[in-house]
């Protein structure tokens, strides 16, 4: 490994102490005396984030709060632009060379690839993936058709939860490289036209974070103590569900140093921050400033619903949380223009839609749809998908659903009924070892029995239903998993690049790898790897590259409306994606057997269905039902073309 540059070494050396300076200091731990007005503090934080550079014209300021701490965040984080409005909405002049291009709602047309830096590619041979390795593989991702990268946390951390236990928000974990390595990666990604977003872990920190270490030693009721949520009794917020019931019995844990209980919605080593404390909100604004000034394109807001707690509620999705997200959005847009906020909120669709009304997040993961895609495949009928699509609440025109099949977590089954959950467990995780909490810890290929037809059908739906598709690293080649690894590490094994040493992931001795490579058939890295699939024209990888290329030809997939098409076969799903004069008919057979279907396409009478992949044209649509036959788990994407070039208005 090369020696880090002086500036990078200084950043790493500052390490965990950096954000101890996030809040203003006072002569003691008690009270709110000595807290600078938020307007002044915001400017100071912005200047620090830019290494002493002045804020750009159009920078927003924050209205000062009422003295004394908590209260409604909407009264604390009130955005008002400065008088210099000429540059409003534009990035600051001192931004890094990797500065994003002006916003164009790019996320609606994006193909997002989720990558774990730790397990993607090792660039220095120490057994752990890093930013040098990720940079080296950007050409591969570009050729796949990826247009945006979502990075899992790469901050300094004890790694008790694979980086979601953050110990310093404004540095790079030494195992993954330096801040300079990150900047070079970001510049190279932008040079290829790829956007980059990363996880912003708002809800909690590690117990090793300096904030928590100071809080547990501070006087009860002091401003430092109140960085977290404390109680003398574990009886507060009774009835609030435990998210990880396999690992935690309660949301409260006793701290012998503080001699009090602290609140945590996830693991006991991840105490929740207290967002009723304006100092916490200021500190997180500093984190946002730091990364956006480097040119980051946005954030996935991790565990978003749980920022606030209120007695007598489920402590999820509270009005205070939505108020904070609105102010965060306004703060970012006033300073940096449009950067994307992607909500991770495992909630019902009606609750999720509240984040997508145009003034909070740009995108949200569609947690209600994902398990019903698998339920439809298990039942071999379209009803579970249709139920979600018909009941889907309206979202703002500029907002978008993020669609996914798998990710780094378990396949969560919280958004289905207990009966449906049991049905899904029996279908996809008959082995109890494959289950964790209320979900399944398997990758996509093992979930679908490594059945190529089912995999292709799942991807065809992912890339054609309304929303932006998100691919989990390794799923493009049908990687397997390792359920002998604990918890969710089962689906976070090293990327399989070749059939050589360590699957081509690292040149280190196998004993030094951050995680073992998959060696069990049929997913052994010698059989399932990028190198072999690139050489095979009919591989899953090359098939997916073609699918992505076809999707990119039709903006209707990313921006168009959805029209459900009636048919006479419950095992077939049919819909039209439409944008202006562009209309794409999607027909999918959810059964393992050949199916015929008569579709009501009278509204498109006279149109010629043209295969989006090969260009073959079918007979023209008439007013009577249109008959199609689909192979097992087969699908069609037809471009509906009228000879004179006009498409009729939908009914």
Describe each model-derived feature in a short phrase:
Residues 2-6, 12, 16-21, 25, ...:
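Active-site and adjacent substrate-binding regions of carbohydrate-active enzymes
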Residues 30, 71-74, 80:
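Compositionally biased, low-complexity intrinsically disordered regions
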Residues 40-41, 47:
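Compositionally biased, intrinsically disordered low-complexity segments enriched
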Residues 45, 62-66, 74:
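A generic structured-segment signal
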Residues 54, 64-67, 100:
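Cationic, low-complexity basic patches in intrinsically disordered or flexible, solvent-exposed regions
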């Amino acid at each position: 490994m090369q020696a880090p540059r002086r500036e990078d070494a200084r950043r790493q050396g500052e390490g965990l102490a950096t954000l101890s300076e996030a809040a203003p200091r006072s002569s003691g731990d008690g009270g709110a005396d000595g807290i600078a007005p938020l307007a002044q503090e915001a400017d100071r934080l912005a200047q620090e984030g830019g290494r002493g550079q002045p804020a750009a014209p159009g920078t927003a300021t924050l209205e000062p709060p009422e003295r004394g701490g908590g209260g409604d965040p909407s009264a604390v984080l009130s955005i008002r632009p400065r008088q210099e409005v000429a540059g409003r909405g534009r990035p600051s002049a001192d931004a890094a060379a990797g500065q994003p291009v002006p916003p164009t709602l790019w996320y609606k047309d994006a193909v997002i690839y989720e990558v774990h830096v730790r397990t993607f590619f090792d660039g220095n041979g120490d057994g752990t993936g890093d930013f040098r390795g990720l940079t080296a593989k950007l050409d591969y991702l570009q050729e796949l058709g990826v247009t945006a990268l979502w990075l899992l946390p790469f901050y300094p951390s004890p790694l008790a939860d694979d980086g979601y236990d953050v110990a310093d928000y404004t540095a790079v974990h030494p195992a993954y490289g330096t801040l300079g390595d990150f900047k070079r990666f970001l510049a190279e990604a932008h040079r290829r036209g790829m956007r980059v977003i990363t996880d912003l872990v708002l809800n909690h920190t590690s117990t090793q974070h300096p904030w928590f270490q100071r809080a547990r030693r501070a006087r009860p009721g002091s401003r430092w103590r109140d960085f977290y949520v404390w109680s003398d009794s574990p009886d507060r917020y009774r009835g609030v569900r435990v998210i990880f019931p396999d690992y935690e019995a309660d949301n409260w844990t006793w701290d012998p140093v503080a001699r009090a209980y602290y609140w945590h919605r996830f693991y006991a080593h991840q105490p929740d921050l207290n967002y009723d404390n304006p100092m916490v909100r200021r500190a997180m604004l500093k984190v946002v400033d730091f990364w956006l000034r480097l040119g980051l394109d946005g954030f996935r807001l991790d565990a978003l619903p749980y920022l606030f707690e209120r007695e007598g509620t489920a402590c999820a999705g509270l009005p205070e949380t939505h108020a904070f997200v609105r102010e965060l959005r306004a703060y970012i847009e006033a300073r940096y223009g449009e950067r994307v906020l992607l909500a991770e909120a495992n909630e019902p669709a009606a609750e999720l839609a509240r984040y997508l009304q145009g003034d909070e997040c740009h995108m949200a993961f569609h947690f209600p749809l994902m398990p019903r895609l698998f339920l439809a495949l298990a039942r071999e009928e379209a009803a579970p998908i249709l139920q979600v699509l018909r009941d889907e609440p309206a979202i703002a025109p500029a907002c978008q659903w993020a669609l996914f099949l798998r990710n780094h977590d378990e396949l969560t089954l919280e958004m289905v009924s207990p009966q449906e959950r049991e049905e899904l467990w029996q279908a996809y995780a008959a082995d109890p070892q494959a289950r964790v909490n209320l979900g399944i810890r398997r990758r996509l290929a093992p979930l679908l029995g490594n059945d190529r037809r089912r995999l292709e059908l799942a991807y065809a739906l992912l890339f054609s239903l309304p929303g932006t598709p998100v691919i989990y690293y390794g799923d493009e080649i049908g990687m397997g998993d390792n359920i002998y690894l604990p918890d969710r590490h089962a689906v976070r094994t090293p990327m399989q690049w070749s059939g050589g040493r360590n699957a081509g992931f690292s040149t280190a001795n196998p004993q030094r790898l951050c995680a073992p490579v998959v060696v069990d058939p049929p997913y052994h890295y010698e059989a399932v790897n990028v190198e072999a699939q690139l050489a095979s024209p009919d591989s899953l990888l090359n098939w997916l590259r073609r699918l992505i290329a076809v999707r990119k030809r039709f903006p209707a997939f990313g921006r168009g409306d959805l029209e459900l098409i009636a048919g006479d076969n419950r095992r077939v799903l049919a819909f039209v994606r439409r944008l202006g004069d562009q209309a794409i008919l999607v027909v999918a057979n959810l059964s393992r057997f050949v199916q015929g279907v008569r579709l009501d396409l009278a509204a498109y009478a006279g149109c010629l269905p043209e295969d989006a992949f090969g260009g073959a044209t079918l007979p023209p649509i008439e007013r009577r039902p249109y008959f199609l036959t689909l192979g097992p788990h087969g699908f069609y994407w037809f471009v509906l073309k009228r000879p004179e070039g006009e498409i009729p208005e939908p009914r």
